[in-house]
Regions:
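Adenosine-phosphate binding glycine-rich loop
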Residues: 16, 20-152, 158
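Single conserved hydrophobic/aromatic residue that forms the stacking wall/gate
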Residues: 1-7, 12
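Active-site loops and adjacent core secondary-structure elements that bind or stabilize anionic groups
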Residues: 10-11, 157-170
Length: 170
């Protein structure tokens, strides 16, 4: 990692933003451990490749993987379910906000940027729900008012029932 870049970031903010996005892991601009070491553990880190957890200053830190698998499936699901005319900037912004809002207390306390991967279906359902609410508000649905007639609980369950579940047991 170029120390001059980290130094510049540390002059601007208390928690430098370090997003080494190159793939594969062997080509990454820096490792999670290097980022923590060069920022005294204060960095905001997400990588394009997976990195192992690091114990730094007696605390186990989790390297988040910045990837589109949290947002794009939910955007596609929302658009398909309501037969959206198009996906506007409001919907994309709402997807990003919904992802940020989906962190639970444990994840927030661990300074995670993204929810745990094990929760991806739950998160996708939540993001799709929030996106559909914006699609309804902005008049972009072509579902003959079906989703607009549902209350929030009905809509949330309706989305969940239509999510694809990979089942290769037969």
């Amino acid at each position: 990692i170029p120390l001059r870049l980290v130094g510049s970031e540390m002059c601007i903010r208390d928690s430098p933003i370090i997003f080494p996005l190159s793939n594969p892991t062997s080509k990454s601009e820096c490792t999670f451990e290097e980022a923590l070491t060069h920022t005294d553990g204060r960095c905001v880190f997400a990588a394009g490749s997976p990195f192992p957890d690091v114990t730094f200053q007696g605390r186990t830190r989790v390297a988040d993987q910045g990837n589109n698998f949290y947002i794009f499936p939910a955007l596609g699901l929302a658009g398909a379910l309501v037969q959206a005319k198009h996906i506007n900037d409001n919907v994309i912004t709402e997807a990003a906000i919904a992802l940020a809002d989906s962190l639970n207390k444990e994840e927030s306390d661990a300074d995670r940027l993204y929810p745990r991967l094990e929760r991806v279906r739950e998160i996708s359902n939540y993001i799709a729900f929030r996106c559909i609410k914006i699609l309804i508000r902005d008049g972009l649905c072509r579902d003959n008012g079906l989703t607009a007639s549902m209350n929030d609980d009905e809509l949330y369950k309706w989305i969940a029932a239509r999510m694809w579940l990979p089942d290769y047991s037969h």
